[in-house]
Structure formats: C-alpha cells, structure tokens
C-alpha cells in the first residue's frame, strides 16, 4: 500500500525546508539567466528560449486568467533558469480562450477538436522547422492550476501520439477529466500542492497521486508548507530593495493577519487571504503588486506556483531526459 498523505508530508517537510532556504536565502532579485524571446504564433503570444543544442524542451502552461507572460513571473523565471542551466529550452504560449477565464481546454483529448492541443502541435512543428529543436528532442511539461490539469491531458495525448514526452509537473491542479481514471496517466508525473490551498484543495491531488502510483506510473508528491511572514521573499522581486521589503511586511502586519513576529493570527485561511489583500503598500512598489501578491501567497501556502520544488523536479526529469 502507498504511504498515507500525512507520512508523505512529514517525510518531506525537512527536505522542503532545506530546499526553500536555498531558494530564498540569498535575497537576490530573480531575473532571466538568458534573454527570453518574444514572438507570436498564429496570433498568440509566445515567450521562449531555445539553446543551440537543447537537451530538452519545456512546455510551460499558465493557470486561469493567465497568458504566455506566466514565464516571466518571479517563480516561473526561477524554475526556468534552473532548467535552462541544465540545457533545456522552453516555450510558453497563451490558451486559445482569451476572454472569460482564459483557460486551457481540458475536457477533450481530441487533437483536432481541442483547439489548444491542435495549435500546440502546429507550434511544435514550427519550432522543429525554425529552431534547434528536433523531432526527437525530449519534451517535458509544467503546468499551474488549470495549466496543471492541461499538462496531464497534453502530456498523455502527445505521448500516445508518439511525441517524445518524458515527464510532467502538475502544480496545484488535478488530472484532467479525460485522463482521470486510475491508470490512464502513464507519463511520469510530479504533483505538488500547498497545505492551505482552498482554491484547489490538496485532497483530490493526493488521490490523483495515490491512483497514479498504484497504477505503476512513476510519480512524486510535494507539499508547500506555511511559513512566517518575512521580508526576504520580496527581495526576489526585481526593483524591490530591503527598505521596501520591510515596508511591505509592515503593511501586511498592519492588516491584522500577522503579528509583529510574522506569525499568522487570523485563524481562518480564507479570511486571512482576503484580509491580506487590503494592505496599503508604499507607492514605490506600485508596479510590483502582482509579484508581491505571489510572494505573500507562497508564505501563506495557498494557491500559487512556487520554485521551492525545482531541485526535486529537475532530479525527477533527469531520470527520463538523457544528458
């Protein structure tokens, strides 16, 4: 029998803490290690980087209300930097749905009827024809929330179609409906969730992990833990200095969610999250409010993409992508 979710979590807490310290300890702004290319394909934005001899190609899928620019958010950039350093290229584009929730289509596994799957196949052909990506270049996928559901659909459909899909990372999301039956997902998969996520609660993700593991598909499950409010994570945001990071923390403490020691004192996590958004930040950081919100959500361990697991994800990918 697989281990229960509680032991899984407890066994990983210490390792997660070490990895997290490695991510944030330096307090340095996260910027692209290589220049990202901005282009369009069939009218949709594309952000990408392809080295001369790519070891593999990462497809990055945003969550609801997202776009190709997901690649340029602090945590995404940190993840991509790590993988680029290991020889990968990446591509990030936007979902076909550009109104409403701007989500990926996760209800259909048809490579023709599903507009996202169809366009991504054409985009891949374009990359093979115009960059150093070859038809045989190993492919991995990373998705957040709705993008996590989509990466499970895309990964399995592409694997079934003969594409060299080697592994995927589903962050803060469940397996998409067409592949949700136990044993249907055969692509090696990392699942990750956060202990306080009330948008996509951990329970169903844990169930997906257990079902995938019992079916014999290589899989791992990572949890993000809540941590005390500190200024260091905000130093990861380009343009924010230590004085501003301290002011950000002061503004968040002033909402009443945390005490002066950075400990959350509003017990209900949904109330705490709603209260935190009322913070009045200094005018000098007005252009970075989205990134501030992201880093705050990470400390609260709610629904947010995180780079804290990138070392483990890279090691997982390494098992299936040759050097």
Task: Identify the function of each model-found stretch.
Residues 31-50:
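N-terminal cap/lid segment of alpha/beta-hydrolase-fold proteins
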Residues 55-63:
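Short beta-strand element of the alpha/beta-hydrolase
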Residues 72-88:
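Short amphipathic alpha-helix adjacent to the substrate-entry channel of hydrolases
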Residues 92-115:
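Cap/lid segment of the alpha/beta-hydrolase catalytic domain
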Residues 107-131:
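Alpha/beta-hydrolase active-site loop
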Residues 136-186:
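Primarily recognizes the serine-hydrolase "nucleophile elbow" in alpha/beta-hydrolase
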Residues 166-249:
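The feature captures the conserved acid-bearing segment of alpha/beta-hydrolase catalytic domains
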Residues 217-323:
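C-terminal catalytic histidine-bearing segment of alpha/beta-hydrolase fold enzymes
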